[in-house]
Each structure stands twice: as C-alpha cells, then as structure tokens.
C-alpha cells in the first residue's frame, strides 16, 4: 500500500516535471548571456509583463465596443466597390442617354458634341454626378465615398475599355 499512488499525485508529479524542464531551459539561456548585472530580467519575464499590459487594454467597455463597431462600419461604408461604381456608371449613362443635361463645370457646345461616356467620366471626376446609391442603409452620393478609391476604379475601368477600344 505504501507504493500505491493516487491519480492526483501523478498529475502533480507531471506538472513538476514540466516546470523543472522549463527552469532548465531558462538556466541554459542565462548561461549563454554574459552580463555584469546580477539583477538581469529574463526574456520570459518581459513577455509576462507585456501580456499583463495588453490584457488591460483588450477589455473595452460595451459602450466603447459599440462605438468602435460604428466607426468600422462607417469606414467600410465609405469604401466603394467595383460593382457599385459600375452601377453608378450605367445609371449615369442611361440618364444622359435619355436627355439629362450633363452637370459639368465647363458646360459648352463642345460638351454636347463629346461622347456620352467621356461626359459621364468627367462628371464623376469633377464630383458632379447626381446618382445616389444605398449602402448599409444609407443613401450615398459619389462625394461621400473615398476619392482615391473612386479614382482607382475609374482608371481601372478606363484601361479595360481602352483595351477593348470602347473609349
């Protein structure tokens, strides 16, 4: 009976074995480092301290979390996709073809002689396109979107149409 072990004793002895193994690794790494200070911090100590610091910043209050989610949604709403810009282009083209007057800053007789596609691109680049789309429950015009994203997609569409000789 003296030699019999309880399950808890086995578990405790296993934990101690792992701890002694970890301590051996730390002592080996300390041997490799040469320093004059007797009070040096181990690398594992610095990780624990930084973990404690991150732990306090990672637990926001529910109110802060909802504000953060709103900010992320608003930032996402302001990005325009290629699909959305294509819809705006097609709607603008249809309205111009049906007789809508182009909303350009320099409206002249030459504007009416120009291609509808070129007029459509000029309107969008100048920020005068009257098309409004609904995204995430909001009605947005092209001026509400990120200017770089809109211009990037317009340039992409223009290069495709130039390669297809439609522009």
Curated annotation (Swiss-Prot):
Protein name: DNA-directed RNA polymerase 19 kDa subunit
Broad class of the protein's primary localization: virion
UniProt GO molecular function: DNA binding; DNA-directed RNA polymerase activity
Catalytic activity reported: RNA(n) + a ribonucleoside 5'-triphosphate = RNA(n+1) + diphosphate
InterPro entries assigned to the protein according to its UniProt record, in alphabetical order: DNA-dir_RNA_Pol_19kDa_poxvir (IPR007984)
Induction text: Expressed in the early phase of the viral replicative cycle. Expression seems to continue throughout virus infection.
Gene: RPO19
Start and end residues of each stretch annotated as Disordered: 15-41
UniProt function note: Part of the DNA-dependent RNA polymerase which catalyzes the transcription of viral DNA into RNA using the four ribonucleoside triphosphates as substrates. Responsible for the transcription of early, intermediate and late genes. DNA-dependent RNA polymerase associates with the early transcription factor (ETF) thereby allowing the early genes transcription. Late transcription, and probably also intermediate transcription, require newly synthesized RNA polymerase.
Location in the cell: Virion
Broad class of enzyme this protein falls into: transferase
GO biological process: DNA-templated transcription
One GO CC term on file: virion component
